[in-house]
Regions:
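Glycine-rich FAD pyrophosphate-binding loop
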Residues: 24-44
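Conserved N-terminal glycine-rich FAD pyrophosphate-binding loop of Rossmann-like flavoproteins
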Residues: 37-57
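A conserved beta-strand/loop capping segment in the N-terminal third of enzymes
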Residues: 53, 57-109
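Predominantly flavin-linked oxidoreductase catalytic cores and closely associated redox partners
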Residues: 114-261
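FAD/FMN-dependent oxidoreductases across multiple families
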Residues: 233, 238-322, 326
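C-terminal helical "tail/cap" subdomain of flavin- and related membrane-associated enzymes
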Residues: 320-412
Length: 412
């Protein structure tokens, strides 16, 4: 038996839960499919820029976020070798102009609960096995792994919001075939008792990678970073008895004095998490009839910490486009042509609002992890620390996509 929905959303991270909430509120029947049980830790820098606070309010989770998140992030630092350079972070408009950090085990749980409260049907933990059909008549086969139970969902429209690490079934072979020595693998760990100032957001620069630190909820420090596959392979060979995450931590302590100082008396909570390889780049128009948001649409190098921002804002941009047109987008007679037109417009909007963030992040990432450009840039940043402030502004940390802002205003 097939359970029918207007829309199926794949992935219940910030992008997926946000679009599910917005569509459900607009009268759509929505299936929200997520393969992992919540709460769960996730590889992520966990920063939420202030430009997204109004979006969290509109989704109904703003007060809970404000109560739990870490301190306002007012300063940015660049750490390389033994040196640290500090500059102010730019302020966004509004009553709360600076970003804050909240662990994904809390943020994602808040957002998926909001989607369910709005009327979305939560399929969790169910994993997507296959998608067939086309606009107006998609069929999704899902499986509950712990019981081996399977179900079939019908949906007129599909939104992919599965992030970086879990490609759609149709993408898996291509991902495996595309691996190179330049691939980036991501790591994250949490620490208690760290001495990093709560208002400071350090960016880490070292050969073959980059990273960051932030103090999130309950004073817990998040340390996250990326490392090229060839550097990771050499690191593992040099430390054959260590797990990859432990070897990565040793590298950071050795190559960034700021990390060693911050973690000097800290204790790690839980194991290191690892994911990858990352796939920075644009995938918003894959040509398969599926709408894409969040990292499924396009992934920025995480050096600028814009992943959650792009996830939330891209969900609002898509919702503003499709939510009012449920009848035309879901009717079998019109779905194919209307969805094609909507996808063209969505691709145009997405590139206009987010492509620059990807380009800026790529430029910063390649400077940070390549020794020669990093060495050349360092004297300039040391002399003019305001470059760091400008860099945060260039990556759109203080701006919200206009379509998202207008939708928030409509809810208000």
């Amino acid at each position: 038996m097939t359970t029918m929905f207007d829309a199926a959303v794949i992935g219940a991270g910030p992008a997926g839960s946000a679009i599910a909430t917005l569509l459900a509120r607009a009268g759509w029947s929505v299936a929200l499919v997520e393969q992992q049980a919540f709460p769960r830790r996730k590889v992520c820098g966990e920063c939420v820029a202030a430009s997204n606070f109004a979006l969290l309010d509109a989704l109904g989770v703003g007060p809970e976020f404000a109560e739990r998140a870490g301190a306002e992030l007012r300063r940015v630092a660049l750490m390389r070798g033994d040196e640290t350079i500090v500059a102010p972070l730019p302020a966004a408009a509004g009553a709360h102009p600076f970003g804050r950090a909240l662990g994904r085990e809390y943020l994602d749980t808040l957002l998926v609960a909001a989607a369910e409260a709005a009327g979305a049907t939560r399929w969790q933990p169910w994993s997507l096995q296959a998608i067939s059909g086309s606009a107006g008549r998609f069929v999704l086969r899902v499986r509950r792994d712990e019981t081996a139970e399977e179900a079939e969902l019908g949906a007129a429209l599909v939104v992919a919001a599965h992030g970086s690490w879990q490609p759609l079934p149709s993408e898996r072979d291509e991902r495996r075939d595309a691996r190179t020595v330049g691939d980036l693998f991501a790591f994250k760990a949490n620490f208690r008792g760290a001495t990093l100032a709560g208002d400071l957001l350090p960016v880490l620069s070292f050969p073959g990678g980059y990273g960051g630190m932030v103090v999130a909820d309950d004073g817990v420090l998040t340390l996250a970073g990326c490392l090229r596959a060839d550097r990771l392979r050499a690191l593992r060979a040099a430390h054959p008895g260590l797990r990859a995450g432990d070897a990565f931590e040793a590298l950071l302590r050795n190559e960034c004095r700021g990390v060693a100082d911050a973690l000097d008396v800290a204790t790690r909570e839980g194991a290191w998490l690892a994911s990858g390889p990352l796939r920075p780049g644009v995938r918003v128009d894959a040509g398969d009839g599926v709408f894409r948001i969040g990292n499924a649409a396009g992934e920025a190098h995480p050096i600028v910490g814009e992943g959650i921002s792009m996830a939330l804002q891209s969900a609002f941009v898509l919702a503003a486009l499709i939510a009012p047109a449920r009848a035309e987008l879901t009717a079998p007679a019109s779905a194919a042509s209307v969805q094609r037109s909507a996808q063209r417009e969505h691709t145009r909007l997405w590139r206009r609002r987010f492509a620059r963030r990807l380009a800026v992040a790529a430029a910063f990432a390649h400077v940070a992890m390549r020794p020669a450009p990093a060495a050349a840039a360092w004297p300039l940043v040391r002399r003019w620390p305001g470059i760091l402030t400008a860099g945060a502004r260039w990556s759109d940390k203080t701006r919200c996509a206009p379509e998202a802002a207008r939708l928030v205003a409509a809810f208000a």
